[in-house]
């Protein structure tokens, strides 16, 4: 996919879902609109590391004791969830994928890939990631993050470069358990409207 996959941290992640993690990699990109503020690290799997709404941090933050998957919000592409025995079966063919939660493969490959920024405005960011080995097909993934006055709109697109292939996509958010101080009764409304 890219040279980012050859670093020791990403190699470890491909072998063990719960590997120790050095924290966000590369430079962050910030988006702001109204009472919303978003921070994304393209080189850290296009992970949203911070989402602040009306002064409250909504996402779980990285700390030294965190494992690779345990903070922020990252895209799961080209598969979401678990592939049993790290095997993708398509028709009569079987494809082996990295078993990062042996014996299974979890959450795709996007979370340990470096993404490229292809468009950046004050309230919008579009990122691109090529798809390739160890995924058996060639393609690309586009992720668009847009802040509106009272919402974060996320979009993932998967494009093939030649033959069609099966794929799935989604996000893995780690929300904080408590907004603000323990004695405050502020509530967070999360509204998911899937478009499929």
Indicate residue ranges for each PLM-predicted region.
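Surface-exposed acidic/polar loop and edge beta-strand patches at domain peripheries
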Residues: 2-155, 164-169, 173-196
């Amino acid at each position: 996919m890219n040279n980012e996959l050859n670093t020791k941290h990403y190699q470890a992640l491909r072998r063990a879902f719960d590997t120790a993690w050095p924290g966000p990699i590369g430079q962050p990109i910030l988006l702001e609109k109204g009472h919303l503020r978003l921070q994304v690290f393209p080189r850290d799997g296009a992970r949203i590391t911070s989402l602040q709404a009306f002064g409250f941090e909504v996402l779980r933050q990285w700390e030294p004791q965190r494992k690779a998957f345990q903070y922020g919000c990252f895209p799961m592409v080209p598969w979401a969830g678990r592939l049993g025995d790290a095997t993708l079966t398509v028709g009569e063919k079987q494809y082996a994928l990295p078993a990062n939660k042996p014996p299974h493969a979890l959450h795709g490959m996007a979370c340990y890939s470096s993404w490229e920024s292809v468009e950046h405005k004050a309230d919008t960011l579009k990122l691109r990631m090529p798809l390739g080995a160890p995924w058996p097909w060639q393609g690309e993934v586009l992720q668009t993050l847009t802040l509106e006055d009272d919402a974060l709109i996320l979009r993932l697109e998967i494009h093939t470069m030649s033959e069609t292939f099966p794929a799935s996509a989604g996000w893995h958010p780690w929300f904080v358990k408590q907004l603000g101080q323990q004695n405050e009764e502020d509530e967070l409304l999360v509204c998911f409207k899937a478009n499929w």
